[in-house]
Structures are given as C-alpha cells and as structure tokens.
UniProtKB/Swiss-Prot annotation:
Its EC number is 5.6.2.2. Belongs to the type II topoisomerase GyrB family. The gene is gyrB. InterPro entries: HATPase_C_sf (IPR036890), Topo_IIA (IPR001241). SMART domains: HATPase_c, TOP2c. A type II topoisomerase that negatively supercoils closed circular double-stranded (ds) DNA in an ATP-dependent manner to modulate DNA topology and maintain chromosomes in an underwound state. Negative supercoiling favors strand separation, and DNA replication, transcription, recombination and repair, all of which involve strand separation. Also able to catalyze the interconversion of other topological isomers of dsDNA rings, including catenanes and knotted rings. Type II topoisomerases break and join 2 DNA strands simultaneously in an ATP-dependent manner. The keyword Calcium does not apply. This is DNA gyrase subunit B. PANTHER family: DNA GYRASE SUBUNIT B, MITOCHONDRIAL, DNA GYRASE/TOPOISOMERASE SUBUNIT B.
C-alpha cells in the first residue's frame, strides 16, 4: 500500500459510473431495503408530477413476482424527440444523464413533488434491467436498458391512441446484496 497522496490519487467518477460506485450517496442504504424503496419513489414521483400538473388521472404501481417493479401512468409521456445537444432522444437523456429532466425551468411543471429526489437515471443505473415504454403522439416507443446502458436507440414499436409512460425495473443484485424483496 502506498502512502502517496498527490494529484494522481484524485479520481473523477462521471455520469452513472459514480452512482454505481457509491449508490448510497444517491438512494441511501443498499442493504436494509430503504434504497430499494427510494428507487420506487423516484419513478412514482415522476408520475405524481404529471398528475399534479393536471395531465395524469391514473398511476398504477405493481410489484411483480420476479422482484421487479413497474409504474404506469396516463400522463403526457416522456418526450421522445431528439435532444439537440445530446443527439439522442430526450427519453434516453432523461434515463441516462444525471440532473436531466423537465423540472428545471418554469415552463414544463408549475408544481413538482419530485425535485427532492435523485432522478430516474439513478434508478436506471442501479437496475439490472429497465424497460421504458412511452405512449405519445400516436406512437408506442420502447427502449431497454441494462445497468443503465441502452441496448439500442428508442424505437417505435406500434401505434396508440393513448398517452403515458411505463417503467419496469429489476434492481441490480450486484448493488442490493441484502434485502432485495419489496
């Protein structure tokens, strides 16, 4: 072991790698179940924000037998257009970039219950798998992530006359070594 402490000792963790390296800084305890619950609250808070803004009438939270959790709402659906600065869909930006979302200006949400949280990108980073399905503008969009990394770009998989967002996630067993049941 070296006793050297100099500029080479300083490590910079960027993006979701920081979340995976130190998950407790973002969601709390990863052993006693509270971190798992925090992840659920993060996704539910986004749906509640749609309801508070007057765009959502129904939120369905399901705990599945495979220890995954899904949250479905009938809000506007996460934006699916290409984000000009990032070059990928706005949905992918929201799911993969810390501190990205529609609650930082005065136009998208007048009321928000979710700003105290860490964001859905943290849930994505700490999930073995996450499925995102968006009903918006007459289309059904879907993207699958593994450990926060998209398998592919957001794709149109069908047509719809509905709107809303569906998120289903499977918490990472590498992160949650203690309590992994909801």
């Amino acid at each position: 072991m070296s006793n050297t402490y100099d500029s080479s000792s300083i490590k910079v963790l960027k993006g979701l790698d920081a979340v995976r390296k130190r998950p407790g800084m973002y969601i709390g305890d990863t052993d006693d179940g509270t971190g798992l619950h925090h992840m659920v609250f993060e996704v539910v808070d986004n749906a509640i924000d749609e309801a508070l803004a007057g765009y959502c009438d129904e939120i369905i939270v399901t705990i599945h037998s495979d220890n995954s959790v899904s949250v479905r709402d009938d809000g506007r659906g996460i934006p699916t257009g290409i984000h000009e600065e990032e070059g990928v869909s706005a949905a992918e930006v929201i799911m993969t970039v810390l501190h990205a979302g529609g609650k930082f200006d005065d136009n998208s949400y007048k009321v928000s219950g979710g700003l105290h949280g860490v964001g859905v990108s943290v849930v994505n980073a700490l999930s073995e798998k996450l499925e995102l399905t968006i009903h918006r503008d007459g289309k059904i969009h879907q993207q699958i992530y593994r450990s926060g990394v998209p398998d592919d770009r957001l794709k149109v998989i069908g047509e719809t006359d509905k709107s809303g967002t569906f998120v289903r996630f499977w918490p990472s067993l590498d992160t949650f070594k203690g309590e992994t049941e909801f």
